[in-house]
Amino acid sequence: MMKYRRFGKTDLEMPVFSCGGMRYQHKWDDVEWKEVPVEGQKNLEATIDRAVELGINHIETARGYGSSEMQLGPVLNKFRRDEI
């Protein structure tokens, strides 16, 4: 069972583990969607699915992580906002 802690002085509950997105990207550079390997995207989706299953609802990414944001978009879109 995932443990959660209050985030700073807010009422938000954050999991003690987060899913860091630095290595989710296909490349460090911006790429066309068609360049992302299907197997790599399936692996990313399975990773996020399992993380959410385990109660990890903090998934971070950054503009500097290449194609990470583009690849996470379709995966995160399938979850309700209150799940992540």
Q: Which sequence ranges carry the predicted segments?
A:
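N-terminal binding-site loop/beta-alpha segment at the start of enzyme catalytic domains
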Residues: 1-84
